[in-house]
């Protein structure tokens, strides 16, 4: 069945639920999980008029490392073989979905797991969600996990 599960994480409730589902699947199948965080600062242009780009990117990287450390702790506690990766440069600015798909392809993932709604702010309304992009771009199976608060 599944040997390699790519898990995209972003620290949202939906992402946390996706992590739980990836653990369940990996436990059942013996799969390895690769937790991936894509650091992308393109939302900043929609949210603030002035910012220090370097400070913002470092803040995003720090947050990504924290999210990956938390995921790693849960994967270790469950006894799952795993790796983590912080991608600092998306395929192109704002192209988180394309970056996730490219990473899944490069790693030969059997399945991509991610939450349906993450931390994307106003940009989601303008450009569509990361999960929709992954589904439309990937030739691999994709498992989308809804958060409990979605309607």
Give the ranges of each region predicted by the language model.
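Small/aliphatic-rich secondary-structure junction motif
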Residues: 3-52, 74-80, 150
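Short, well-ordered secondary-structure micro-motifs
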Residues: 18, 45-48, 94-97, 124-125
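Aromatic/hydrophobic pocket-lining residues that form π-stacking "cages" and hydrophobic walls in ligand
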Residues: 22, 71, 100, 134
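Gly/Ser-rich helix-loop-strand patches that form or flank binding pockets
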Residues: 24, 104-151
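General small-molecule cofactor/ligand-binding pocket signal
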Residues: 36, 83-87, 143
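Acidic, proline/glycine-rich short linear motifs
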Residues: 38-66, 99-102
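Feature marks short, surface-exposed loop/turn motifs that line or immediately flank catalytic pockets
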Residues: 41-43, 90, 120
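Structural beta-alpha unit
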Residues: 73-112, 150-151
